[in-house]
């Protein structure tokens, strides 16, 4: 089947450009890794007649990598070929660069392309955020410390999130801190492109209604036949396992010792393949919420809110889907619908959660994807990240809202 694909996908058509680099960069091969709630990473091998590109001219520079379809048949004599738009373009920055070899004619290089958000993984911070919600904290970090502007990110959220009294960042990079906060409340993110501005955009979402649904590909098992120039999927697999049937939560509110903060939730709606109870104690909530409320009607960061998120994570692992495609436009966050007798597990639609794409001048584009079945009641949730541990003595300073105040003041609860 791959031999058939080579006829309609010409890898010499892929283009790579880096800001302030005028030399032509000819793509030799590439490998890309994408996943929901993770910065993508594309490693692109290329050749250039510039035999000694300086690393300082590439690292940190904006770059663009475009995937093109095979060229159309040449036009009749006297007519120019129409401009062909790329199938997909990835915008980002160069975070890695390597010179592999060289000759008298050209040199071979490799660069790593990632979104600007990946740069937040450098460094670590110790900070306190007060009276801000999780989206507000994320936005303040992006804007104030990393010069993101309104066109660089988008919050597509179905629910409102309460302000937290205090949140601490302790010895974490800004990316690790953001990932930990977002995972805690079930917010996931993906990357899109603004072709008008030529930038990558990170989009934050919290509901399955925010998936992209207009993706359909035929299922064509490998049989040695050509694909007639049409993208398809094959080698579809499904992996099933028993997961927790319900989640039981309990917490203690020190300011209201008599508060009822115990409950249980079952998001499987009686589906088979579940067993057992997962007991979660001391989740960060002070209000239980209403068990019968659905979607955004359920109080954010309440007990049942956290219980549903925890159970959704268990249910995400119940069925894992995978497959291979020749499509260059498939991306995480899309719901793939397959036609042509695909396995039953793919019938509801496959939510693409991860993607590994490879191609070279001598091999066709192949994208191996991971997915979960689409559900109206269960959404993809990023894995919880461990909180940093504070050990030993931590020196600090008692402060006051008044400038040069000689005294430290306490509130009604005895806190500075």
Question: Whereabouts are the PLM-identified features?
Answer:
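Amphipathic alpha-helical and helix-coil boundary elements used as assembly
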Residues: 1-416
